């Protein structure tokens, strides 16, 4: 993004040490397909024909992505743009000549994305790019889900917990929130499908929604037992590789158990690929608790987060490929 030059920017550019943030943002500058994403959003972006002209679309998209990478609320994002030269440089903001989007503008941009279902559009655009580059294959899918906690407190304006979130028990612990269900490409570990549900929705119920229809093999943990017998999947000509429950393995005769355990270990190694995008979203992007109310808003954010996670996963391959 073209940037204005200023003394502060020149001074920052001349510093000798490159921080981890500098390095990450420099990589994202190159791997995010900015012209392609802006073109996807532009037809619906307000033209500012009445009143104050809107901020440039690409600048607002960059600020929105900064929010996702650093888990910043709207007020914190506004403050970060004043505090961090690295973030301002990435967003193309020079304080000497440019206005900084305030928290309301940042909020309104996110609401605009949600209103037009554009987070899903951004996810689809990134997926299309990765498929064109030969990085996203379609021969096999791993299905999995993770719980993301929602605030359980009733100390809010509505004086109630989010009615679209629910409790579920995992092991001996109860969790309140939603589930992020993903379909992941076996060969690359890239996410090709994202579905959001309440936390009490059984994993197996979303299996059909997580398949793109071209896969030959499907892998899942024991939470997907019986997927092949569900009516919506009865006509799928795929090889089902679903983990056997540990209690069943444990109760097998020793001879059968000795045969089953190596197979289960091999399948577990294949399924382990699915943990990488979850790790990036929850640990690198720090998305461990829901920020918004309602499944629609939070699922929209998940589409953005997993699109960005995909770019992180293949950043080396994209950086090695000239042009975009």
PLM feature segments, named:
Residues 1-35, 39-42, 320-323:
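Charged, often Cys/His-bearing segments associated with DNA-binding zinc-finger transcription factors
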Residues 2-11, 216-217, 222-296, 300:
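Helix-centered, glycine/charged polyanion-binding patches within enzymatic domains
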Residues 2-8, 57, 75, 79-82, ...:
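Polybasic low-complexity intrinsically disordered regions
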Residues 40-58:
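An N-terminal domain-cap segment
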Residues 46-52, 95, 292-296:
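A short glycine/serine-rich beta->alpha loop
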Residues 59-71:
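Alpha-helical support elements that line or immediately flank enzyme active sites
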Residues 259-261, 284, 316-324:
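A short, flexible helix-boundary coil/loop motif
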């Amino acid at each position: 993004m073209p940037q204005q030059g200023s003394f502060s920017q020149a001074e920052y550019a001349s510093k000798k040490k490159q921080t981890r943030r500098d390095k990450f943002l420099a990589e994202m500058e190159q791997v995010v397909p900015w012209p392609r994403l802006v073109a996807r959003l532009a037809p619906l972006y307000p033209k500012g024909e009445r009143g104050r002209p809107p901020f440039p679309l690409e600048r607002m998209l960059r600020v929105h992505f900064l929010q996702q990478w650093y888990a910043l609320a709207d007020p914190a994002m506004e403050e970060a743009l004043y505090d961090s030269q690295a973030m301002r440089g990435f967003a193309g903001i020079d304080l000497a000549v440019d206005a900084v989007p305030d928290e309301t503008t940042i909020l309104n941009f996110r609401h605009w994305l949600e209103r037009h279902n554009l987070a899903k559009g951004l996810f689809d655009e990134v997926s299309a790019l990765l498929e064109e580059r030969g990085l996203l294959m379609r021969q096999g899918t791993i299905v999995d889900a993770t719980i993301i906690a929602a605030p359980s407190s009733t100390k809010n304006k509505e004086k109630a917990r989010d009615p679209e979130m629910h409790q579920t028990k995992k092991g001996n612990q109860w969790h309140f929130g939603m589930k992020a269900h993903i379909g992941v490409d076996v060969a690359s570990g890239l996410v090709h499908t994202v579905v959001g549900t309440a936390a009490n929705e059984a994993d197996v119920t979303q299996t059909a929604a997580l398949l793109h229809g071209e896969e030959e093999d499907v892998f899942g943990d024991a939470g997907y037992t019986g997927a092949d017998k569900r009516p919506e999947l009865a006509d799928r000509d795929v090889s089902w590789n679903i983990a056997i429950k540990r209690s069943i393995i444990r109760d097998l005769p020793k001879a059968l158990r000795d045969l089953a355990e190596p197979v289960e270990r091999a399948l577990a190694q294949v399924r382990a690929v699915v943990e990488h995008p979850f790790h990036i979203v929850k640990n690198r992007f720090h998305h461990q608790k829901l920020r918004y109310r309602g499944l629609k808003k939070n699922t929209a954010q998940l589409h953005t987060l997993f699109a960005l996670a995909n770019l992180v996963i293949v950043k080396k391959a994209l950086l090695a490929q000239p042009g975009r």
